[in-house]
């Protein structure tokens, strides 16, 4: 890369101060409103069944391009975009009646060989850990925003206040990094719950650490590949983001072994929320009572690997706390929750109340931590670079609130999704209530994230992104979004899962 252009690129994403949380909430609300419109179209009109070319186009427009437009063309007027999306949803809602029963997806043809297995599936009881459409949608929406932002940030059409801040402040991309980790924590609860239900004997910690390290190897390899690619191509870098050598794949790769250690601690402190807050508190105390904060932010970079990568190394504590907070939420919302004395309606109400209370608690802790709060708050600014306690609380509060909103939309539009007595009928209702594109992004989230990184690098090496005008930027971003969506759908159609996470 040309040295002058590289310097311009690095300056373009450096020294930024971010924007307001209210604006970030308004922009991300577009994802929820788009899902609401999709759900109204499907629940009232069965618009996406069968999945025609028109259905694919509208699905792409609502669940991918709406987010792209919210962060670019409508970045200064996100509320207007929300209004444009919610208006047709309300119009359809008021002018149509809810069908008595959801329209069933067309079942695949049965072969003679598969007939016996399909018959068993048709009469089998639903799983105790069901697939939740709202959880699929939440995770996919987060992934769509992340993939769009990592390329859009290199164009001038993407506001600088949405890009990652230098030291202190909040931004859309700062929130996206933490949300990626939080969502990973949410879905990680499924394996933990499954082992509890099966009553399988817990392996010794040493064996679990070895197994989790094996699980981490693909992520660490991806981190090394990214490191050598960036250095080898002389690619523009934002060193204060993670350090000289560290990158986000290393953070993701180191999470599983550390989570296993805290799983062992959970037998003593049976609350992942407490463990999460405990890590955040201890890390914040270390930042405030020692020279650690100044060492991370302003100390000259020495020759040691620790000094060169201090942001990535020390911020890992914050990301671990975020992951455990997500795991705590997953434990609460993934189980079916029904019993002889609790109906599906009561179980769903319980999930909504739990998410609402959790969102309120995390938000209260965040306000007390990051503002004066009428003289009672600590007024500590948010720092993604440090991944300090206010950052952990902000990410946890936002994601819990997002889950609450998506769960509420599903409850209102598809109330019968889990009111079934067989796996087959429940599977049909889950498919009916889930966007094909969102299912695809959720199924191969890490692989799509990797593809997005590769395409981002290819685009930046091919064109001068910071010199592109609005039309050129939008054309490139729509093409890029189409490619990652197409690949996600192709993998989903072929029932291929490339990487775990």
From Swiss-Prot:
Glycans are attached at residue 198. Its EC number is 2.3.-.-. The keyword Cell membrane does not apply. One of its GO terms (biological process) is GPI anchor biosynthetic process. The keyword Transmembrane helix applies. It holds the Pfam family GWT1. Its main location: endoplasmic reticulum. Pathway: Glycolipid biosynthesis; glycosylphosphatidylinositol-anchor biosynthesis. It comes from the Eukaryota. It is found in: Endoplasmic reticulum membrane. The chain crosses the membrane at residues 21-41, 53-73, 74-94, 133-153, 168-188, 249-269, 311-331, 351-371, 389-409, 446-466, 471-491. Residues 101-122 are annotated as: Disordered. Keywords: Acyltransferase, Endoplasmic reticulum, Glycoprotein, GPI-anchor biosynthesis, Membrane, Transferase, Transmembrane, Transmembrane helix. GO terms for molecular function: glucosaminyl-phosphatidylinositol O-acyltransferase activity. It is a multi-pass membrane protein. GO terms for cellular component: endoplasmic reticulum membrane. InterPro entries: PIGW/GWT1. Signal peptide: none annotated. Belongs to the PIGW family. Probable acetyltransferase, which acetylates the inositol ring of phosphatidylinositol during biosynthesis of GPI-anchor. This is GPI-anchored wall transfer protein 1. It comes from Aspergillus fumigatus (strain ATCC MYA-4609 / CBS 101355 / FGSC A1100 / Af293) (Neosartorya fumigata).
């Amino acid at each position: 890369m040309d040295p002058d252009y590289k310097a311009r690129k690095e300056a373009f994403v450096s020294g930024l101060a971010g924007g307001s949380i209210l604006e970030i909430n308004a922009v991300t609300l577009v994802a929820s409103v788009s899902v609401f419109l999709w759900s109204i179209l499907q629940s009232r009109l069965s618009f996406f069944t069968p999945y025609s070319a028109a259905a694919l186009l509208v699905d792409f427009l609502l669940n991918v391009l709406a987010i792209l437009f919210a962060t670019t063309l409508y970045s200064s007027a996100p509320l207007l975009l929300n209004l444009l999306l919610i208006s047709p949803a309300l119009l359809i809602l008021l002018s149509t009646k809810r069908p008595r029963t959801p329209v069933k997806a067309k079942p695949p043809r049965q072969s003679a060989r598969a007939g016996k297995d399909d018959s068993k599936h048709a009469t089998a009881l639903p799983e105790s850990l069901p697939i939740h459409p709202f959880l699929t949608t939440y995770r996919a929406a987060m992934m769509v925003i992340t993939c769009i932002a990592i390329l859009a940030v290199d164009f001038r059409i993407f506001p600088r206040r949405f890009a990652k801040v230098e030291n202190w402040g909040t931004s859309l991309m700062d929130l996206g990094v933490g949300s990626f980790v939080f969502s990973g924590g949410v879905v990680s609860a499924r394996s933990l719950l499954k082992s509890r239900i099966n009553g399988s004997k817990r392996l010794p910690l040493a064996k679990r650490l070895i197994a989790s390290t094996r699980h981490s190897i693909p992520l660490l390899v991806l981190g090394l590949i990214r490191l050598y690619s960036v250095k080898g191509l002389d690619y523009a870098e934002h060193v204060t983001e993670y350090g000289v050598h560290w990158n986000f794949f290393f953070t993701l790769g180191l999470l599983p072994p550390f989570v296993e250690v805290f799983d062992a601690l959970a037998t003593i402190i049976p609350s992942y929320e407490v463990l999460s807050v405990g890590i955040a508190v201890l890390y914040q105390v270390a930042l405030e009572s020692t020279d650690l904060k100044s060492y991370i932010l302003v100390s000259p970079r020495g020759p040691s690997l620790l000094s060169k990568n201090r942001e990535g190394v020390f911020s890992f504590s914050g990301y671990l706390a975020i992951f455990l907070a997500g795991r705590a939420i997953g434990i609460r919302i993934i189980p079916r929750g029904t019993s002889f004395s609790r109906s599906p309606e009561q179980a769903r109400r319980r999930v909504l109340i739990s998410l609402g209370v959790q969102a309120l608690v995390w938000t209260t802790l965040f306000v007390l931590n990051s503002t004066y709060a009428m003289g009672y708050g600590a007024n500590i600014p948010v720092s993604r670079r440090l991944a300090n306690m206010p950052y952990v609380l902000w990410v946890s509060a936002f994601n819990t609130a997002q889950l609450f909103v998506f769960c509420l939309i599903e409850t209102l539009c598809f109330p019968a999704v889990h009111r079934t007595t067989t796996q087959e009928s429940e599977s049909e209702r889950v498919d009916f209530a889930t966007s094909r594109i969102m299912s695809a992004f959720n199924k191969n989230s890490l692989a799509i994230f990797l593809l997005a990184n590769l395409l981002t690098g290819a685009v930046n090496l091919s064109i001068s992104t910071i010199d592109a005008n609005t039309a050129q930027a939008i054309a490139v971003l729509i093409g890029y979004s189409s490619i990652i969506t197409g690949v996600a759908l192709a993998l989903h159609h072929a029932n291929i899962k490339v990487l775990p996470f």
